[in-house]
From Swiss-Prot:
The gene is cca. InterPro entries: CAA_C, CCA-adding_arc, CCA_tRNA_nucleotrans_2, NT_2-5OAS_ClassI-CCAase, NT_sf, NuclTrfase_I-like_C, Polymerase_NTP_transf_dom, tRNA_NucTransf2. This is CCA-adding enzyme. Its cofactor is Mg(2+). Mg(2+) binds at residues 71, 73, 125. A single active site specifically recognizes both ATP and CTP and is responsible for their addition. The lineage of its organism: Archaea, Methanobacteriati, Methanobacteriota, Stenosarchaea group, Methanomicrobia. NCBIfam families: cca_archaeal. Catalyzes the addition and repair of the essential 3'-terminal CCA sequence in tRNAs without using a nucleic acid template. Adds these three nucleotides in the order of C, C, and A to the tRNA nucleotide-73, using CTP and ATP as substrates and producing inorganic pyrophosphate. tRNA 3'-terminal CCA addition is required both for tRNA processing and repair. Also involved in tRNA surveillance by mediating tandem CCA addition to generate a CCACCA at the 3' terminus of unstable tRNAs. While stable tRNAs receive only 3'-terminal CCA, unstable tRNAs are marked with CCACCA and rapidly degraded.
Amino acid sequence: MEKDTSIPEDLKLAVLEKIKPTEAERKILTAVQEELAAEVKAAAEKLCVADIFVKMVGSAARGTWLSGTHDIDVFISFPEETSREELERRGMEIAREVAKKAEHAEDRHAEHPYLNIVFKGFDVDLVPCFRVESACQLKSAVDRTPFHNEFVKTHIKGREDDVLLMKQFMRGGGVYGSELKTQGFSGYLTELLIIHYGSFENTVKAACLWKPGKKIDIMQHSEMEHTEPLVMVDPTDPKRNVAAALSLDKFCMFMDHCREFMKSPGLNFFFPPPLSPLEDREFLEKLESRKSSQLAIVFKTPDIVDDVLYPQLYKMEQAAAALLHEYDFSVIKTGVWSGKPETVVMLELISGTLPNVKKRIGPPVWVREHAEKFKAKYEGAENVFGGYIEGGKYVFEIQRKYPTAKGLLENQLLNCSLGKQVKSSVSAGFEVIEDAEICRLKDPDFRVFLRKWV
């Protein structure tokens, strides 16, 4: 693809000036990486663990990290024949030995345990893995990361600046990050896009024309069909889609971001102005102008990692909306926000109240057996306003069980399908507040969320 020259060179240079690590930053990073590698080797020797390799992976090892980010991924590589139990036990022993010199340490768990530490100001993951022959013969999901590292390092040379530009551009568009909270583009996916298209400009131009189902297979070795919006076949594993975590909405948000940028390139696409928290007065004005009903389900945030929490929150969000639909409330939109100590599921409805009367339509009168059963059920029953025939069918006007959305959620939310930890937290206590009452929620981050919401 021809290089697109419509993006001003001085704009790219201005962005790089802000995001490209300085030589001093690089030297500090390299020194810390070398020190960490030495600490891991010393810990393994002290604990009599033989045949350990230390591998630096991730953007810091590939030269595609943004200035100001202090993340280092250290993989502690064990021989392939090591048992999983031994890898986890001995790997964590080594990690904890290294952590003795850290400012902070925290056990984390993906497919198997790893240790997150703060070491000389850097956020460091110490991850045990198996040293397998190829990314197609994995013993655990993290085993593929060193292969990603080698592929990118051998193909990205000379295009590191393009990766930096793309990462910051995606950040500006709110689509960077493959964690389940964001459902956006991972760093590895971003690097592969640059490798495939050749530059930042070419990638932006190409993305303007994408459609769901777009497939990119750099090595031309795909073995499987995928149904995700974007399919980036992993160059190291033909069965894997690197873009599997990317949601349809984030895929489309990126396309829109690219199109708007190409119309009028500017720094604001990389560095959008920060949003201020929404003031009470502004929220009340929005309530008055929108004339809708706003509900907030508030409960204590479960003490679990985001990648476990957010799928459960999205499940709860969908379950709450489905419950409201089932009882005739019209949902305009839903959203979730989570902080410490509270989590909020937001719902906007056309109206939070419905009439006390509800129309129940039965079968045609001539379908005798079913029609008579329907009539017998409602005729003369309590909470029935009256009955008649309309359009050849029995109709009864009955009293609505839940005329308010708030009452419905308070009484039926716990009967919905909720994730394990979220259900436990909601069961311990939740509150449904509506409209002006939402002003009680003062967390500044929530108020920024609220500004986007309204």
